[in-house]
Amino acid sequence: MDNCYDPGLDGIPEYDDFEFSPSIVEPKDPAPETADGPYLVIVEQPKQRGFRFRYGCEGPSHGGLPGASSEKGRKTYPTVKICNYEGPAKIEVDLVTHSDPPRAHAHSLVGKQCSELGVCAVSVGPKDMTAQFNNLGVLHVTKKNMMEIMIQKLQRQRLRSKPQGLTEAERRELEQEAKELKKVMDLSIVRLRFSAFLRASDGSFSLPLKPVISQPIHDSKSPGASNLKISRMDKTAGSVRGGDEVYLLCDKVQKDDIEVRFYEDDENGWQAFGDFSPTDVHKQYAIVFRTPPYHKMKIERPVTVFLQLKRKRGGDVSDSKQFTYYPLVEDKEEVQRKRRKALPTFSQPFGGGSHMGGGSGGSAGGYGGAGGGGSLGFFSSSLAYNPYQSGAAPMGCYPGGGGGAQMAGSRRDTDAGEGAEEPRTPPEAPQGEPQALDTLQRAREYNARLFGLAQRSARALLDYGVTADARALLAGQRHLLMAQDENGDTPLHLAIIHGQTGVIEQIAHVIYHAQYLGVINLTNHLHQTPLHLAVITGQTRVVSFLLQVGADPTLLDRHGDSALHLALRAGAAAPELLQALLRSGAHAVPQILHMPDFEGLYPVHLAVHARSPECLDLLVDCGAEVEAPERQGGRTALHLATEMEELGLVTHLVTKLHANVNARTFAGNTPLHLAAGLGSPTLTRLLLKAGADIHAENEEPLCPLPSPSTSGSDSDSEGPERDTQRNFRGHTPLDLTCSTKVKTLLLNAAQNTTEPPLAPPSPAGPGLSLGDAALQNLEQLLDGPEAQGSWAELAERLGLRSLVDTYRKTPSPSGSLLRSYKLAGGDLVGLLEALSDMGLHEGVRLLKGPETRDKLPSTEVKEDSAYGSQSVEQEAEKLCPPPEPPGGLCHGHPQPQVH
């Protein structure tokens, strides 16, 4: 092997002359050098994810870089082949950047056939022209060695095309090129560049074929390198209108680099994205989003689409899951269906109603004398004939279809001389039989009740003939007002459904004066009271009338909605319905103002969803709490208005209703967190003017906390004490925003406000408290020509990556960064550790004064925020532990999975 590889010839000859066309990015279809000439093709791509780049102090990888199709029990490795050629050849592979055109990468390949600068070579031929690389590893460069390695790689590359050496001008040019590469290079992504060399006439391998480039390989320790995976969803179907809230559990994602994509896999190519903000991503493992509307509102049957997680920057996607859109339910409350139904007859569902009518008519003459033409007053004559108190059981004594039996009994009692049918009454029982006597007594009582019922019905009909008032008939039949049809609707329900206002008032009047108040609150099979239906159908006058006669507004329907909740969902009619409900004087009004629905939303939250300042004013005037948090996430009305980006509502809540601009959700987010996460300069400016706290931190740590195992032996005894304190820095609005305009607003506001008191120092160390001289020296070091963009990496390590674009054009980016870090409550140890990991030992020396050295703890554990896009793996070799146990790691990190 050594005979065919000269380690002094690393790199690719005449690299600068190569024109990397888009075909190189798709290596499975390479362009040959000539129409029928030899060319290089990738047979097996490397695996894109799951492989870890390792530092030199960690030792070699356990197993080489696997192939894309590698599985347990069937290992594959990156493989290439020279086509249209047979004979001796040499194939080399090195690392290049993932951007186009590909440039030399600072990381290096390691393996049995690899040189010190990371170029691996194998010989192939003369028959088998396939090369398999089965022991490749990726050596992660340290920041302090990055420039040196880049210059060496570029020099070797240039020397292959210019063996006579480099001039001083060319060396300076290479150094400048290395500096430019360092600024833009992503240390978490590499690609393999395969190059083939055929044997020339002089016996050397100096005839190059066109290189081919592999697909990107992501460092498994990089925040954005993990495979996207949907673990669970609480809903797999929703309305075609969208807006359904879905809780999705997933593997680790980045708040600012993830989206939920809905799409159809057909010729239309429809796609849409779930609606959520960075604050809806919970600790990188759960996303709460609202479904987008389907592109067709009118569908006749359910439609199944797909959804997947997708990274915004890299475009990586997860496996797709199915989601079903169901047709729009226009008549959710089934009012229209019931209106289309034919009107019920008296025989349905009461049974025998027509016979009852005939019987009553036949008996009217017999009761004429008793009626005596007396007037009802208010149904006094009808009530006088009631044989049982209100609430007794006439329905039980009056079985359906029994009209004929009732009238027969009445004839026998009133006109015995006319020969009533004997089977209608029990036969005479023999003397001395108690059971027979008891049966006879019950039969007589039954007939007496039937007689009273018939008499009352007859009197009601007579009174109706005198007064022409339908309430006379209703009073006589008031016990039937509780009758329900197959949908559970009473006569009052049906009158409201069909909009019969006069009938509604008559029935309600009778119910009220007869003290049959239970009827007014009866529910149908959909758990709807008459008041619910009056609100659903928008009958404001009926709502007021029902409340006056005792309707209970606190009762809930099957969805958990009270009449007030339904009124707030009534669209344009909401203010009038709300007036009727709240101005009725009902004793339950204070109670319904503080009742949530089944989704945990209070009336003030529904008023925000209705986008109605008028409804908000009505609710607050009647005693609703504008600061009430909804039960799912603790959001106030101001939080919801901010999420909806309703500038008018936010202004109304802040200026007129004096909502608390610093109210917090269960996760500690203020409205300013939400506005910043949405990237809305207008809302941000409004909230800042209203006094929003720019320094407010939510409950999600900016940097993951150390595991309990790193806290020492005293962790158990100190645990309860630690639980009472907050020992980490959460995300501020500035940490959540990706908008340059919002960042500028927040930074300007931060400079114009006094610094907040620092949080209790975390276990990592004391707060950042340094003199101006030390900070100025560090600023000069980071902005100096030797640093070349180190401040940007420092920002990422300090969890302030969102500020990089903002500070890039400032006179002193590092100075602005350090001031923001200090303002945010950053600790000294975090800064020292970041500088040390970057190899900036001079900066560590500047900061480590006698007054701070003794304060530093022995443990140094720090991980990056989930908001970065590149790997921030600890890089300083000086922090590597001595070779105690095999596989020990640098910087106190827990043992990762090794590949």
UniProtKB/Swiss-Prot annotation:
Biased composition (Low complexity): 887-899
One GO term describing the cellular component: Bcl3/NF-kappaB2 complex
GO biological process, one term: spleen development
Basic and acidic residues: bias regions: 410-425, 851-865
PTM (free text): While translation occurs, the particular unfolded structure after the GRR repeat promotes the generation of p52 making it an acceptable substrate for the proteasome. This process is known as cotranslational processing. The processed form is active and the unprocessed form acts as an inhibitor (I kappa B-like), being able to form cytosolic complexes with NF-kappa B, trapping it in the cytoplasm. Complete folding of the region downstream of the GRR repeat precludes processing. Subsequent to MAP3K14-dependent serine phosphorylation, p100 polyubiquitination occurs then triggering its proteasome-dependent processing.
Annotated Death domain residues: 764-851
Phosphoserine: residues bearing it: S23, S161, S713, S715, S717, S812, S865, S869
Region (GRR): 346-377
Pfam families cross-referenced by the UniProt entry: Ank_2, Death, RHD_dimer, RHD_DNA_bind
Main function: NF-kappa-B is a pleiotropic transcription factor present in almost all cell types and is the endpoint of a series of signal transduction events that are initiated by a vast array of stimuli related to many biological processes such as inflammation, immunity, differentiation, cell growth, tumorigenesis and apoptosis. NF-kappa-B is a homo- or heterodimeric complex formed by the Rel-like domain-containing proteins RELA/p65, RELB, NFKB1/p105, NFKB1/p50, REL and NFKB2/p52.
Protein name: Nuclear factor NF-kappa-B p100 subunit
